[in-house]
Amino acid sequence: NRIRVSGSFDTPVFSTALYHQSTFNDLFVKGLSVTAGLRLEYEKMSMNYFSDSNIDFDFFLKMAMPPLNIPFRNLNAAPLLEGKEKNDYVQLLPKLAFKYDFSPANNMYVSITRGYRSGGYNVQMFSELIQSDMQQKMIEAILDKAPESMAGMIEGMIKQHMPNYGKELNVQETTVYKPEYSWNYEVGSHLSLFNGKLKTDLAAFYMDTHDQQIAKFVNSGLGRMMVNAGSSESYGVEASFLASINKNLNMNVSYGYTHSTFKKYDGGTTSSEEQIDYSGNYVPFVPRHTMNAGANYSFFFDKSNWMQSLTLGMSYTGAGKIYWTEKNNVSQSFYGTLNGRISLQTKALQIDVWGRNLTNKDYTTFYFETMHRGFEQKSRPLQLGVDIRYHF
């Protein structure tokens, strides 16, 4: 049998902001610039919700000792959730950056910014709420129909097997997730060396995040929800190098390291009422290492030739280790893929022959758990293809 559940949700968002940024050049010494900015943002959001259902059912109370078989027929439960949630937030997001140009193409910088990510509503949680309300209404219908002498016994049995029975549904607590805030600190340098033949970007960063938003599956496994996971910190380094050896050959290498962990994350309780604490665990879906290395060699031909250029390119891309869960019990180790491309350019036509994952590397690109089972999305195997572009 099917049970009809209706739902109507309206989630308007209004936001407005004032922003100012000023840069002061050659402050105190030549080449030193200071940038200061401030963003004032107001965001107002609301959710008008209506969800209801209706079910006719029969209930049979059966016991072996003493022998008991009492039918409760023609019962009805009509769960209803209707109302409005309103939330508004005011943010001050400052920015301060120092940059020193020690030559026209080389500089060092330090920046401090405050980041913000909007909150919202987990509308999909209403499927859980309406189910809970339906259970409550069905139990109330049974108790209303039961003889007064048996109502207490039945209610006691229900509470024994359903500890959440009688608890008031809290729509706001269940559906609302708060904004995420972060303080971001970065120091780095942009360098152009050997007459521009080598360009380098170097950076080190630290992020202090509060009310971090994490996506997770709901208890029923039917849908995902956003939750605020306490606080986390991330720090790391990034480096990239682009070398133009000559007009034919260029090479690039980049590397990033990120250490991202929860400082505080209360994961609730288990079925046995044990506290779950993920503090100190790695933040899921954040690769510890990322890297890329590539080279392109181009052959250039006379403009009178029908073929203007032919470029051969190879690249290697890697990432890992990546944790998939807050428990840190499932992960993907470091992996890398080899890719290649041959590009033919004429005056009006470009033909690219490419290959991805040339070594047919097997790895996991995504993982999630629902209904006590784990599911993973595997990588794409070796791929070959051709792209054709015609310019007119």
List the predicted regions and their residue ranges.
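Transmembrane beta-barrel architecture of outer-membrane proteins
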Residues: 10-18, 38-48, 88-94, 112-116, ...
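Membrane-embedded beta-barrel scaffold of Gram-negative outer-membrane proteins
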Residues: 107-111, 130-227, 233-235, 256
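Repeated loop/turn-to-beta-strand initiation elements of outer-membrane beta-barrel proteins
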Residues: 29-34, 105-108, 195-200, 248-251, ...
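Signature of Gram-negative outer-membrane beta-barrel scaffolds
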Residues: 1-103, 121, 163-170
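Residue-level signature of outer-membrane beta-barrel architecture
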Residues: 20-26, 90, 98-102, 114, ...
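C-terminal beta-signal and adjacent terminal beta-strands/loops
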Residues: 116, 315-325, 343-392
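Extracellular loop and loop/strand-boundary signature of outer-membrane beta-barrel proteins
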Residues: 2-9, 21, 78-85, 171-176, ...
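Gram-negative outer-membrane beta-barrel transporters
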Residues: 28, 197-210, 225-325, 389-391
